[in-house]
Structures are given as C-alpha cells and as structure tokens.
C-alpha cells in the first residue's frame, strides 16, 4: 500500500511540474518539464538522501566519535528489527532530527547538536525511535523525494517570472499564467508536503513509542523541541524550506508566518496522543512535561550524568 501511495504522489508531483511548464511555455514547456521531472524522479531515488544531508551540512559519526548517541540508535534499531542506519550529526543550535534514505538498508538518521545537548538520553531515544519508525514504515523515500521535487517546483515557479514573459514561448495564458505559476505552484507543493507529513507523523509517533517502550520519552522531547524551535532559527532549513517536512518538529517555526502552512500536526495534539498511549503502558509523566524549562542536558551536555538513567544511558 505504501508503494502505491508513493507512486500516486510522484505522479501528482510530476503532473504539477508539467502544469507549471505548460503555464510558462505552453505544450513545449510541458514536454520539457516532463523530461526534467522524469530525470529528477530517477535522480532523486538514488541521490535525494545525500542531497538533503548535504543541504544541512550533516557529518557522519560512529561509535568512536559519538558513542552514546550511536549506541542509542544501534539499540533501537535492534529492537525494531532494522539494519543499522548511518548516523549523522548536524551542527545546529535548534534541537531537531530527521531520517532519510530510499529503504531500510540505505537509511540514515540525523540529529542536531542542539538536540543532543538539550535532551536527556531517554528523550533522545524517543526521538530516534520516531525516526526509525519512519524508516520502518518506508516513509523516508517518499518524504525525501517530495522534498526534492517540491524545491524544484518552487524554483520553476520563480523561473516563470524571468523566462515566461517572452512572446515567443507559446504560453497560452500570457502574464496571467506566469502569475499563477509563481503563486500556485509553491503553494500546491506545500499542500502536498503537509498532507504527507501530518498523517505520517502520528503513525511514526505511535510506532516510535512502541519501539522504545516509553511514549512519554517522545512526548517530553516534543515539548522541549517545540519550545526551542520557536526561539532558535534553523538557518539551513530557512534556506531549504522544502525539507521542513522531514524534521520531527517544523524547523521553520522560528519565523512568524511559517505556522500558517505548517507541514506538521499540532504538537500539543501529538503529545496528548502519546500521553493517552502512556496510559495504556502505565507510565507517569516526566518532569519536563510539567515544566517550562528544559531538564537535564543530553548525551553531549554537561549534566547528562545527572539525568534519569534508562536502558540506553
């Protein structure tokens, strides 16, 4: 079923790409857009994960360079029955994380230094379990390719302003078509990202909680990350907004207008769902859910030794 949804999504994004090409250059522009979209779909399948990691300046780590973080991911991957993914760190003060890769055998997870410094080991485990749930649900291919195509569609809409005004370009709609391409194309791509991310985040939250066995670890992490995302601007995400839906929390929340078209479900609703799930597990709320300030620092923080210890500490 996931493969069918992915195929339908790629078909829609390709059709949107062709529609923008038609608005810019008529039937000739549409055919050129089709060729470009087909090439991008093929290229994205093999390279989108590398492109996204490069956009955010992710650096691969191992058990020597980041022992506790790496061990958390390794233990969770074993619990989920997944191959060990490649593990990356992003030097960014905003706490956040994402997963990418075309399949579980070629998956990668990435966490920011802000996340590793500000979250407890248990909360980091909750976040990484969520990302591994995306890998297990095979969301990563769809989400990564969508990020690449959405960025291309937005760029094509911008090109319309510069190249669409030529009278010889066979544009049947004239300047009106150019305006439509500039405005509607990026919005349509954003709506697709919203539809993908909002439904899959809830599923990944639930499966991630099952993997780590503690729904409130993830709930506590979401509360901390959401608060910080409104205060700390993620510069790389602002430069590449098409990748926003990959992250566990919208990285664009530091800007005032970004919540208007948020790619993520409401954080409070996600936390409430996890708390309800914790009721089934018989868990008690951790302190960080009841306080405004973050708790003990995480695997790379100075006070990690004072944090409540769990299986991955």
Swiss-Prot record:
Principal location class: membrane
PANTHER family reported in the protein's UniProt record: PROTEASE HTPX (PTHR43221:SF1)
Single annotated GO MF: zinc ion binding
Cofactor needs: Zn(2+)
Gene: htpX
Matching InterPro entries: HtpX_protease, Pept_M48_protease_HtpX, Peptidase_M48
Compartments reported by the entry: Cell inner membrane
Positions of transmembrane segments: 7-24, 29-46, 145-165, 172-192
Protein name: Protease HtpX homolog
EC assignment: 3.4.24.-
CDD domains: M48B_HtpX_like
Keyword Membrane in annotation: yes
Residue positions of the active site: 131
Gene3D superfamilies given in the database record: Metalloproteases ('zincins'), catalytic domain (3.30.2010.10)
